Amino acid sequence: VPRTSWRAAALAGATAVAAGSGAGGASWLTYTYLMRQATEARGVIGRTWAKPPEADGVYLPGAQSPVPWRRDVPFDLHLMIFGDSTAAGLGCASAAEVPGVLLARALADESRRRVRLSTKAIAGATSRGLAGQVDAMYVAGPPPDAAVILVGANDVTAKQSLHRSAQRLGSAVHRLRAGGAVVVVGTCPDLGVVGAIPQPLRTVVRTWGRQLARAQAAATRAAGGHPVPLADLLTPEFLSAPDRLFSADGFHPSAAGYELAARHLLPVLAAALGHWAGGPVPEPPLTSAAARLWLPRTRRGPRERLFPGPAVGTVAGEIR
């Protein structure tokens, strides 16, 4: 996340809080305080220039590694990943941990078909960049059978217009749907689970993130896509086990965090393609009581592998 993004979030947050207070002195104090917190958050989280592992290829049922993609390599389904660094898998140590790979492998096993994975996601991207990613797709070839979009966190920290961000996402979904692709969108995650962001800045970005997620879900549905509310589904787990679910930078998910997200994305993706045999896919929550709660007092459970058993449980222990 660029330094200017944190400064933009702090500045906008100070403006909003000060407007509510109606006091000039409070405005300056709030601005100074939140700007200092933005600098602190950027210093703790740091900058990463690492590239996510490259994971594209054709995944066969039961195979651990892909067949490198060439024009003469056959496949049955084409899965394409769009969005930001979480879509690209920043924080993963190996290609096998990347969310696109988790989904491609699981979809190949579920459908018993050969799944080609192509990644257009770019670290640091906001919803503004989705149009360019879709353009790049059309330059490379025809639309895929399925697309997964993960985007939103950078829109929040850069304090882009939530309405415009949702519109841009909806436009990307519409273009992909017009090309015949099934589209699944993981909406903006809950930035309130990032402990490196100090209070009250954390509350500011958390509130914006949840507002953006709701707008993204509405725009996705209107364009014919399938939204998956990651904030509502993942917040309890990330609050209960941050050391396990965050990567070393404290901001991006770890392999276990991406695995947890893939558990929630796969049933929606496979069902939309007509290849889900795991029973009825429940309607995703519009809101979650657990996601509104703040600091957990929990026990940590063991890491589970992807999809062989029941989904990772909800928060263990008491939440204060």
Language-model segment annotations:
Residues 119-121, 187, 229-232:
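Residue-level recognition of beta-strand->loop/alpha-helix junctions
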Residues 150, 186-187:
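Alpha/beta-hydrolase-fold catalytic nucleophile elbow
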Residues 1-78, 274-320:
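N-terminal secretory targeting modules
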Residues 108-113, 177, 222-224:
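Short helix-capping segments at alpha-helix termini
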Residues 179-181:
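A short helix->loop->beta-strand "cap" motif at the edges of active sites that frequently abuts
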Residues 78-80, 88-167, 308-317:
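Conserved SGNH/GDSL esterase-like catalytic core that processes O-acyl groups on lipids
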Residues 167, 171-175, 211-218:
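Alpha-helical scaffolding segments of alpha/beta enzyme cores, especially the outer helices
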Residues 192-320:
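Catalytic His-Asp segment of secreted/periplasmic serine-dependent ester chemistry enzymes
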